[in-house]
A protein has these predicted regions:
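N-terminal lobe/hinge region of extracytoplasmic solute-binding protein
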Residues: 35-92
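Aromatic- and charge-enriched surface segment that lines or borders ligand/interaction sites
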Residues: 85-141, 165, 171, 342-344, ...
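Surface-exposed binding/hinge segments that line
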Residues: 137-221
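Gly/Pro-rich hinge or "lid" segments in bacterial periplasmic/extracellular proteins
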Residues: 178, 188-270, 277
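Alpha-helical secondary-structure segments
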Residues: 33, 116-123, 167-171, 243, ...
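Ligand-site clamp/hinge motif
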Residues: 232-235, 263-311
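Short, well-ordered beta-strand elements
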Residues: 28-39, 98-102, 120, 170-171, ...
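Sec-dependent signal peptide cleavage junction
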Residues: 17-28
């Protein structure tokens, strides 16, 4: 599907024009109240394991930012030198492609626990498993990694295309049908997650020479309770690796609070956050302009409606506010999960299509 490039009027209605979440230099005290037109859903699981609310995603990105590869300011996939010490790739005789990654030593989660290679791999093994599907997660890693389908179907005990080489080195092998791919660096945009936090003490990642697998009580019953807690937890015990820690979420007011993670090593440019606290709150279409002018919040994001853009420009003309305009490459799509759930049935998909 063709990507549409649209111009969006944005996010930067700041009372102080210099207040940027990723400014260089010494941390400056202060709080930004971020007004979001999309309410927080409260599902803070990695990526879109279950849901993918836009504001939830923004919070996830602020709390999990240690991707091996990331997109730069121009939208190009680049290697993240904060995380990756070395990356090598080779196209195999069967057409598959193997990426071998060595991460930097000394990286830690917000709780001080050291990040190692296994932290990047277990979630990929999880994405290849029937256990993920049993918990309702919408993950399809078995369609990307060599050996993933065999692991998913139970004909193999490990994912052969995911290898734990040593404490700081791992490799992933991508199926030949997925190669070549212009954006293949995205295949190694893996982020570290604490296995203990997400799946509990009863499991561990292992590689006995044939590929990675999750050992222990790796069943729906064995991990579901901890997964549920980890998804929705917002507190001091939440383990993450990003510029901010999610320390509170009020379901009644739909307000989340994030504070600086002092253990954060920096983004791909080495930048660290300068705003001490970010409060994310729900705004209303009918009242956002007045709320902004009276100081209820001081940052309003992603203004795309023509009338709202004109209102925003009027506020800026009055003084005390500024804006940032940015490009967005994106498209809208409605797709069906066809291998399980109600939409596995053709009649259901046809019925939904007839409603459009």
């Amino acid at each position: 599907m063709k990507k549409l490039l649209s111009m969006l009027l944005a996010a930067a209605m700041l009372v102080s024009a210099g207040a940027m979440a990723f400014a260089e230099g010494t941390s400056e005290k202060g709080t930004i109240v971020y007004g979001s037109s999309t309410e927080i859903g409260g599902d803070f699981a990695p990526s879109s394991w279950w849901t993918n609310n836009a504001t939830d995603k923004m919070i996830r990105d602020l709390t999990n930012d240690y991707g091996v590869t990331v997109t730069n300011q121009g939208g190009e996939f680049v290697v993240n030198p904060t995380i990756a010490n070395n990356i090598e790739s080779v196209v195999n005789p069967d057409g598959s492609k193997t990426f071998t990654v060595t991460i930097n030593e000394g990286l830690t989660y917000n709780n001080g626990e050291e990040i190692k290679a296994a932290d990047f791999l277990w979630a990929e093994v999880f994405s290849c498993s029937k256990v993920a599907m049993d918990t309702g997660a919408k993950l399809t890693g078995h369609l990307t990694y060599v050996g993933g389908k065999d692991y998913y179907e139970g004909t193999a005990t490990a994912v052969s295309g995911l290898r734990l080489i040593d404490d700081y080195t791992f490799s992933v092998t991508i199926l030949a049908e997925k190669i070549p791919y212009y954006y293949d660096l995205n295949y190694i945009g893996l982020k570290p997650f604490s296995l203990k936090y997400w799946l509990g003490d009863g499991v561990e990642l292992k590689d006995d020479g044939e590929g990675c697998y999750i050992a222990g009580d790796f069943t729906k019953e064995g991990v579901e309770k901890q997964l549920e807690y980890a998804r929705f937890n917002a507190g001091e015990d939440r383990v993450s690796a990003g510029p901010y820690n999610l320390v509170a979420f009020d379901k009644g007011s739909l307000q989340a609070t994030l504070t600086i993670n002092p253990n954060y090593a920096g983004n791909f440019e080495g930048q660290k956050p300068s705003i001490e606290k970010i409060v994310v709150t729900k705004t209303e279409d009918a009242t956002w302009a007045d709320a902004l002018k009276t100081g209820a919040f001081n940052f309003y994001d992603t203004v795309t409606d023509g009338n709202q853009i004109n209102t925003a420009l009027d506020i800026i003309a009055e003084g005390g506010f500024d804006y940032v305009q940015f490009d967005r490459a994106g498209y809208g799509m409605l797709n069906f999960q066809c291998d399980f759930g109600p939409t596995q049935f053709e009649a259901v998909r046809h019925a939904v299509a007839l409603l459009l």
